[in-house]
């Protein structure tokens, strides 16, 4: 054992404790007494106002005798007083406001400027009354010593100029401006004059501008202060648009050329940006002889002596390319492109092994400037593709694009990720050139980059899968080999972060995957992940996004066995899950299924599991189900679903009679009233439900076509796998037998018309199925997955009904429906044992059916229902 520590080390004696207490008592004595109130009784008395005063009287009193904070409150409330009682406000309150503003502080001045602007925008008074009462107050405070206050009043005045008549502008603003713009006035006064002149040019005719405004403009362009010259230069764009092309060429352009050679860098920068913005006004000669040499000079000086213009130059490169397109000689074109490439890698060549803390501040500032330049280059990359022609992208710009996608700075990669969709559109068939860069950005370590990329991820992937010369099917399998690992890694990275909105957005965008990759790839790589997110994630919007995307995956899954497995998982793990949270998510999933699938699909698989939750022990689950019941009822069709309607009504009655939770009971009562008001949809088309029934019919057709496609693929695989002798024997057998015998035994025939059909008709039936399947493959997956409630257009409907040669609509639908029933009976996976069957609700189960038909009780009633629907368009 270790020896005990010495007594000195354990300082917990009674004396030491008393010493601590004495120290604490001393601290309490030193403490200053805390005031119980922030205001003294005298101050409270001064701030108290008689509550019987009207709003106008209270405002007058506070502006006269109140404190500054009370006066500011009255001025902030001035727009309300103007709306309530404009006459009294103008007569009694506004004079007090004028008096208060003479000695007001910054806060009251800013509040007044904002209130005056609000009154103008609200149109509480006429323009004439506003001019008479408010304009002089605004003009009086334009030259306030505080720059922020002066700018606030200036913004108000510029808005007032938009609505004032010409005569008022001339007498109240333009005439006084002549003296305000003189050199004898303050710099602030001349700066204000520059901005007012830029606004006035759009209000007068060219003659007045030439005679009264342009002399002032020239004078201010040659002002001794660089701030004034720069400010006036930035207003030349507005002035040029007001005076027309001729005066711009003769007056504005010479001033811009002179200002572009100014000694002040801010003036040169303003001149350059104004020239770029005015490119469309100048003709080809002016661009080639005057502006192009200036741009060339700017580009050369930017690297040598004037780096301050680099950021602006890189930002306006796109406009320059567009405005000077067709003017460059081949040599100038090449030099400009090389200049852009140089900007894209600016600062990347300067490698150093210093720590960021050891880098001098000047170097850090320069690196920030270079990052901004590269970011602007990324922003203008689509414009540069147009500049070099997309056909030359690989030779001219691919290496630059590669550098931007791999830039060490996040803002650069973020910007190029935003532009990625535009780049993909411009490349069109050459989009395959940037496959690797898409994967790189999907795997980027920064979630900001991923978030920017996924905004247009469905459109990008669609271009990737359909671009080039190969077909859609080939692209789905071969063109993006690294896409699936990149997508899964991106989702896992988003899930591991705290940025759940990015995760939610990514899951929503995954709904486009059925158009890009195969059904099996989605099933094995993404479906289980959606289940995991629904079961384990803690963020509700993320869970809902995963649920909706899973429903879309299920909607376009092309294997019935996989579909059944997913449905069973949804019901067992969510609908019958131990956690009430999972059962709530099951109801969310049911809502998405109602939206995405046909009514018959929901009724067959999810109707009964959903209404069984009326017996759930958790009140929140029952409450959520009550909100969903109107949508559940809307999936029923009478008379085929009469038995389901009876079960729904029985569950609602039990809730009304047995519900003990008062909140749930209140919602049940409201839901019952809503259910009673609902009109039921019939099997036959009704005028009021025509559009909804048509959309539902289209969804059902697509679901049946998926089954047909699966059956055709299996038949094709079986035929491809048999020996040649078997195929020859089958061909001879088909030639000698009747068409009815040549069809599979488990598909009953329901074809009206003659009993004998030629062998060619059998081929036409299969051919029509193949045509419909191919048309569905080409059309159904092109739907906008964000709006799946809007199904395929009428063209697909026409293609479906007119593709059958020699047979009517009834026969085709009968065959399709029979195959649907047969698949239900024959292709259920082995995991579905008789003891735990997949919950299924069939319409018309009360009718008896010959068990030899297809093994499903509802085959004939279902067939009749479909026939009646198709025969009543």
From Swiss-Prot:
Biased composition range(s): Basic residues: 864-873
Keyword field contains Cytoplasm: yes
Modified sites of kind Phosphothreonine: 797
Ranges of Basic and acidic residues composition bias in the record: 713-737
Alphabetical list of InterPro entries matching this protein: ARM-like, ARM-type_fold, HEAT_type_2, PPP4R4
Biased composition (Polar residues): 822-858
Subcellular location(s) of the protein: Cytoplasm
Region (Disordered): 713-766, 822-873
Taxonomy, superkingdom: Eukaryota
GO biological process: blastocyst hatching
HEAT repeats: 213-251, 252-290, 392-427
tRNA processing is among the record's keywords: no
GO cellular component, as recorded: ciliary basal body; cilium; cytoplasm; cytosol; intracellular membrane-bounded organelle; protein serine/threonine phosphatase complex
Phosphoserine carried by residues: 775
Gene3D superfamilies per UniProt: Leucine-rich Repeat Variant (1.25.10.10)
Subunit: Serine/threonine-protein phosphatase 4 (PP4) occurs in different assemblies of the catalytic and one or more regulatory subunits. Component of the PP4 complex PPP4C-PPP4R4.
Role: Putative regulatory subunit of serine/threonine-protein phosphatase 4.
Protein name: Serine/threonine-protein phosphatase 4 regulatory subunit 4
